[in-house]
Each structure stands twice: as C-alpha cells, then as structure tokens.
C-alpha cells in the first residue's frame, strides 16, 4: 500500500504535459525555413485580417526568401522580413493599418508586425516575442502606447526561435542587435 502512495505522489509531482498548440480550424499556417531550423506559425485571420492578408501577400510574392533576422534582442524579440544579408532594405508595398487594438497580446511565441514610431508604418517586417512583452501591447492611442499588432503565434519550432534569440549580435551599418553570423530566411510557404 505504501508503494501505491509513493507512486501516486511521484505522479502528482510530475510536470503536466505541454499545452497543445493545435491551430484553430481555418486559420492559415505558414512554414518559415531558416538557416537555423524551421518555424511553423498559425495566423489569426479573424482577429488581424489586414495584417494576415498583408503577410500572406508577401509570402505569395516570394518576398521573404533571402531576408534575414536583422534584429535579435535576447529575452525580448527576433525581428526580420525587411533586409537582405548585406543589410540592404528591400522595397515594400505601402504601410498597412495598425491592428494593435485587436485584443491580442504580445506573449511569448506570438508574431507581430514591426513598425516605426509612426502608427501606420508596418509593411513587411515582423517579430516573434521571446518572452511576454506587455510594453508592446495596446494600452492607449498615443504612439508610445498604441502597441504592435499581434497576428499569429508559433505552433512548432519555438526551440528554433530561442536558438536564434541566443545568437551573438553587434552593430553593423548603423544598426544594433544584428547577428554576427546572418540568420537567413530561406523559404516561407503557406501550408494551408
């Protein structure tokens, strides 16, 4: 009987299985192949329709292959989708509406549109949150607190995101937090 209680106690102390990251039916899935591994992302088409349509158009246009994760801040974000390996900025379509008011939060593993201080300046660049970043959430209507529009989440490959988030960085061509060895986006494909 005491062995039963010992085993029961050990079972109760065991960590719970990881929460399932199953995508919602109908949400688009995109696979990002990088020089460090593959990241699979679910896109929130209902909560962020403008951002998702914009991102998917860049995917369908073949815009992202050859771009790099040009900004890596450990414990914060990895950002990419706008510069080539030599840090040449790619030409983009016009900026889109900022959907930061959609109620989605910048939690670990979420994907959001990058922008400048101008509220409607997001084009092709996006970032993945390495940790919860409430300072990036919408809390008001001035540029400092308007927030960054979350439009998806990583459902596979967060280990790859974390490895990218741990690369050595420095300054290059007037930009900070640039990986010393380029981390290249090799392909981005729409899975569904």
What residues fall within each predicted segment?
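Sec-dependent signal peptide recognition
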Residues: 1-9
């Amino acid at each position: 009987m005491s062995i039963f209680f010992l085993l029961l106690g050990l079972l109760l102390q065991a960590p719970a299985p990881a929460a399932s990251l199953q995508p919602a039916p109908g949400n688009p899935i995109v696979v990002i192949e990088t020089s460090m591994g593959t990241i699979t992302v679910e896109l929130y088409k209902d909560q962020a329709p403008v951002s998702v349509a914009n991102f998917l158009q860049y995917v369908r246009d073949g815009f992202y292959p050859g771009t790099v994760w040009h900004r890596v801040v450990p414990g914060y974000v990895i950002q990419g989708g706008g510069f080539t390996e030599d840090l040449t900025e790619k030409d983009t379509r016009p900026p889109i509406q900022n959907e930061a008011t959609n109620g989605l939060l910048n939690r670990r593993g979420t994907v959001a549109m990058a922008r400048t201080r101008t509220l409607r300046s997001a084009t092709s660049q996006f970032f993945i949150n390495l940790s919860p970043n409430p300072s990036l959430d919408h809390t008001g209507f001035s540029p400092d607190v308007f927030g960054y529009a979350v439009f998806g989440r990583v459902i596979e490959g967060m280990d790859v995101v974390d490895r990218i988030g741990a690369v050595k960085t420095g300054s290059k061509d007037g930009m900070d937090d640039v990986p010393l060895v380029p981390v290249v986006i090799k392909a981005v494909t729409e899975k569904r």
